[in-house]
């Protein structure tokens, strides 16, 4: 089944992720309509796909031939395209750059649930070849994760015209927390957060989170009942002009200590792991790239007879987690999440 898509906005990864994936999956998707707050960009992309540019996203979503929307970028309209897609019964692919306010998470969940549309959130780290292969190794060779370490280094001027530095930091933290939860196969049960901000800035330039994954009463008695500890650090303290310093001797994006071994990941394709037999290096370049994995999963969710709500629940859980992390920073203590 070929889906006719409406495209709203262009992400930072449009040229490297979404555009190549749409071309590779031309038998599953057809871009039929394009909206962008900058009309010249909409016209250019529409020409690439022989699609129709629109002056308004509601007008585009009201078009009867459009079956689903790729919502890739927030602009002046915020999350209004999600409301419009629900009004017109269009499936929603919600890109990782969309700004979703934590305090509106419950309203978003209720809106999508009542509309009955398919909803998929973009969690690119989950579907990177290295992440998927690690999950296989956890199930077959390495055993359950006991400790996870994640580090992300951003340039100090990491904001954009649409995003403030704090919003970028929050988005990174939500994605990193979700990544740890995905790898461990357990929800976050508690968070202890610390932060630092420079004297000449009102925004945080460093944040560290200590997470406990699992270990709740609901997990007791299961094979995966022991909690996993995750340590996340995300910093934007190096000026963008110091390009060499930003990338100097960065640690692996994720390190995982499992029952039977240790793994080091760098996205999208690098995975090195160790067990009693020694060092193993995975060759993952031939695997489907992240963009194709994401869009293939979206196509499956739209065409499936079974409606999946897990992505929406994960988005709401991530937004709740960032709120709890802020509270932990303010109160200087470990906070527990409602399960």
Segments (PLM) and residue ranges:
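N-terminal Rossmann-like dinucleotide-binding module
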Residues: 1-48
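Active-site loop of classical SDR/Rossmann-like NAD(P)-dependent oxidoreductases
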Residues: 13, 284-296, 313
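Conserved acidic residues
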Residues: 32, 67, 146
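Beta-loop-alpha module in the N-terminal Rossmann-like domain of NAD(P)-dependent dehydrogenases
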Residues: 38-40, 49-111
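C-terminal helix-rich "cap/oligomerization" subdomain common to oxidoreductases
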Residues: 46, 59, 68-71, 117, ...
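Hydrophobic residues in well-ordered beta-strands that form the structural core
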Residues: 55, 94-95, 119-121, 265
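A contiguous active-site-proximal alpha/beta segment in oxidoreductase catalytic domains
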Residues: 76, 100-160
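Contiguous beta-strand/loop segments that form the cofactor/metal-binding neighborhood of enzyme cores
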Residues: 171-268, 295-304
């Amino acid at each position: 089944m070929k889906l006719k898509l409406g495209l709203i906005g262009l992400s930072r990864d449009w040229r490297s992720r979404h555009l190549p994936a749409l071309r590779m999956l031309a038998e599953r998707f057809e871009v039929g309509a394009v909206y962008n707050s900058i009309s010249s960009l909409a016209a250019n992309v529409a020409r690439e796909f022989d699609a129709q540019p629109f002056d308004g996203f509601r007008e585009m979503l009201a078009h009867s031939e459009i079956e689903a929307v790729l919502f890739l970028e927030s602009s002046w309209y915020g999350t209004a395209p999600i409301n419009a897609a629900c009004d017109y019964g269009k499936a929603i692919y919600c890109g990782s750059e969309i700004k979703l306010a934590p305090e509106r998470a419950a309203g978003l969940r209720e809106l999508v649930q009542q509309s009955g549309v398919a909803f998929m959130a973009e969690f690119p780290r989950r579907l990177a070849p290295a992440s998927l292969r690690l999950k296989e190794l956890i199930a077959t060779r390495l055993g359950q994760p006991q400790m996870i370490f994640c580090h992300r280094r951003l340039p100090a001027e990491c904001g954009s015209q649409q995003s403030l530095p704090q919003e970028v930091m929050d988005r990174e933290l939500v994605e990193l927390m979700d990544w740890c939860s995905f790898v461990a196969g357990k929800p976050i049960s508690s968070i202890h957060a610390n932060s630092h901000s420079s004297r000449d800035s009102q925004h945080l330039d460093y944040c560290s989170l200590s997470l406990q994954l699992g270990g709740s009463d609901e997990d007791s008695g299961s094979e995966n009942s022991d909690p996993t500890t995750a340590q996340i650090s995300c910093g934007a303290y190096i000026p963008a002009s110091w390009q060499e310093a930003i990338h100097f001797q960065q640690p692996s994006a994720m390190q995982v200590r499992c029952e039977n071994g240790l793994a080091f990941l760098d996205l999208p394709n690098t995975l090195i792991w160790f067990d009693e037999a020694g060092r193993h290096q995975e060759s993952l370049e031939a695997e489907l790239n992240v963009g194709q994995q994401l869009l293939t999963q979206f196509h499956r969710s739209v065409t499936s007879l079974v409606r999946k709500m897990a992505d929406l629940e994960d988005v709401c859980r991530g937004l709740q987690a960032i709120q709890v992390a802020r509270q932990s920073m303010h109160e200087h203590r470990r906070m527990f999440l409602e399960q």
